[in-house]
């Protein structure tokens, strides 16, 4: 595949993982919703990210403006190289893989696209996301309580 020879082998291997692929495709779908809502006046076209070159999107390749394409390319790489396994929600992760500006953009995009995704055919994915979110929130809270208890014990 043209362009694939320049891709990092680790990226290609990680993108073979169905969880990584599913997350990247979901990000692509969400960024399309954001781009449609915020950049409707911009020229958009088929994107050429490494994920597209690998064929992870199938026939549903994202059509985005240049700015959103750059965000998608960055997000694909961050997801592929996530050091956590299983990957927690980024909001509850101790390791921040995203640059601060990119993290803020992703949060805003998710806040906008999440509720709208239900009307775009992602209702089941949304329900799974809510259930997983509750699980990771509880794990993060339990970890914080344990850390606080350890700190209290050490200070005595």
Show which residues each predicted segment covers.
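Cysteine-centered metal-binding/redox modules
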Residues: 2-156
């Amino acid at each position: 595949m043209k362009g694939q020879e320049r891709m990092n082998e680790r990226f290609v291997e990680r993108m073979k993982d169905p969880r990584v692929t599913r997350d990247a495709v979901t990000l692509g779908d969400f960024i399309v919703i954001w781009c449609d809502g915020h950049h409707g006046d911009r020229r958009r076209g088929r994107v050429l990210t490494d994920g597209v070159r690998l064929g992870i999107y199938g026939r549903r390749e994202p059509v985005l403006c240049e700015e959103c394409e750059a965000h998608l390319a960055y997000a694909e790489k961050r997801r592929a190289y996530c050091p956590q396994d299983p990957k927690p929600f980024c909001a509850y992760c101790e390791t921040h893989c995203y640059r601060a500006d990119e993290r803020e953009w992703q949060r805003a995009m998710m806040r906008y696209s999440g509720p709208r995704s239900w009307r775009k055919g992602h209702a089941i994915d949304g329900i799974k996301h809510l259930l997983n979110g509750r699980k990771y929130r509880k794990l993060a809270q339990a970890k914080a309580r344990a850390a606080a208890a350890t700190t209290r014990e050490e200070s005595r």
